[in-house]
Amino acid sequence: MNKQRIVTTLLLAIGSSSCLYGVMFTMLDDYRNNFGIAESALGFIVGVGFFTSFIGQVSIAPLADRGRAKRLIVLGLTLEVIGCIGMALGQTFVVLLVSRTVMGFGAGTALPALRRVIIVADPENFGRNLGRILSFEVAGFATGPVVSVVIADFFGIPGPFIFLAGIISCFILIISRIAVPETAKEHQPTERFAIDLLKNRAIASGILIGVSLFFMIGVFDSLWVLMMDDLDAAQWMANIGVSVFALPLVVL
């Protein structure tokens, strides 16, 4: 497989992974109404996944720079599939919490490795690919509510999660069979954990900007669907609102 096809495949895998978040946010009102889970508990379920994702990024993800990117991608995406199935079948706070924890850790393991391989596979287009990575992440997130509103009407809460678990499983099979370019040994870093990079003020500043962006997204999306449900708005209107909120990020 040539490098352009590898990059495209990995970008689509990133988009599918991000789509999970769009689906999850738009199903919060269904969890509340069908299973009686409190809003505060739902907020905790959503938030814990971001924390476990961070743990995965600073602990295991740096191994992608040491020639293990492919293994991390397969491992991370597999954990996402497991968490996704748990979110589909779970009906209690504990089950959903564990599933979200696994899903978040999987994302924190796979996504940095996916980004790393894209950069290594096509170094001549480094800047363009960085922009494309963000665009596919946001586009995947914005597609999630559309997937929810179309599939959940026919198959209920499990439908969108099972659908995405199947899509991500296909990417696991594809990626496990292709030759993924790894970081050359002479370019592998000496730092053991990614948190060591925070000593660099420029990197720390960029991370804080990213934190503020995703803090805004997390607050808005976790409240939007619940608020629209309380206002008796149509389900499609609540879901499309999440997509419209994210679309400008794709263009910009």
Listing of model-derived features with the role each one plays in the protein:
Residues Q4-G43, I217-M228:
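Helix-loop boundary and gating motifs at the non-cytosolic
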Residues F50-V58, F141-A142, A246-V250:
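Residue-level signature of mid-helix packing/kink "hotspots" within the transmembrane helices
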Residues G83, V94-V102:
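Paired small-residue
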Residues I55-A88:
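Conserved MFS/SLC helix-loop-helix module at the cytosolic interface between two early adjacent transmembrane helices
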Residues F25-T26, A204-G241:
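Extracytoplasmic gate region of multi-pass secondary transporters
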Residues T101-E137:
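Cytoplasmic helix-loop-helix junction between adjacent transmembrane helices
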Residues G166-K185:
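C-terminal membrane-cytosol helix-exit motif in multi-pass small-molecule transporters
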Residues M1-K3, V180-G206:
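Juxtamembrane intracellular "pre-TM" segments in multi-pass secondary transporters
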